[in-house]
């Protein structure tokens, strides 16, 4: 668990992203938030967006943000039976996974920011979808496939296979175009990272 901060404020008032990554499947949730959210608001969002879909985790690793070290946050997780651990600087098991995910998310946002014209929070679900349906070398598959045991049906494929039925559906067309754009940006960013690593 970690936050991406310093983002431009959207018309909805969101200015940060709460990143939550499953250690086993590498699946991630990107939740648009206001940096001013209280720990109580974060706890409500956590139950609504994480616990309801995945149940209560055995353990959580987060950075040492004051909200995660607060008495309230600790008591909520103690009541749920979740062990809290805090990342230690330069310890790859605790801080590496979220940091890599956040770096990928930041790269995706930077690549798409001009295309989304200040409404990054509206496209965040599609960015999350694209991230979770992209191949991860560390697990040998996409996080979605690791989580659900099958590949995900994608709007990109809906458009390609049933084009005649869906052409009139503007929402599907816009969603498909956004997912394709995000995937292209991800590929470009990934190529740049690979090129940089290869030069080392």
Task: Give residue ranges: language-model regions.
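Integrase module of LTR retroelements
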Residues: 1-200
């Amino acid at each position: 668990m970690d936050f991406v901060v310093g983002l431009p404020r959207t018309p909805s008032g969101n200015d940060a992203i709460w990143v939550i990554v499953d250690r086993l499947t590498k699946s991630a949730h990107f939740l648009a938030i206001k940096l001013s959210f209280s720990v109580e608001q974060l706890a409500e969002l956590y139950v609504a967006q994480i616990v309801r879909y995945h149940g209560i985790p055995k353990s959580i690793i987060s950075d040492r943000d004051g909200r995660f070290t607060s008495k309230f946050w600790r008591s909520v997780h103690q009541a749920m039976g979740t062990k809290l651990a805090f990342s230690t600087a330069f310890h790859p098991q605790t801080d590496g996974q979220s940091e890599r995910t956040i770096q990928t998310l930041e790269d995706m946002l930077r690549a798409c920011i001009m295309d989304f014209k200040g409404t990054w929070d509206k496209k965040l679900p599609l960015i999350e979808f694209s991230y979770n349906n992209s191949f991860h070398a560390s697990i040998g598959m996409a996080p979605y496939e690791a989580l659900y045991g099958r590949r995900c049906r994608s709007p990109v494929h809906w458009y390609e296979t049933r084009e005649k039925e869906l052409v009139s559906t503007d929402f599907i067309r816009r969603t498909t175009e956004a997912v394709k754009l995000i995937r292209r940006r991800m590929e470009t960013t990934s190529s740049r990272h690979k090129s940089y690593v290869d030069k080392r």
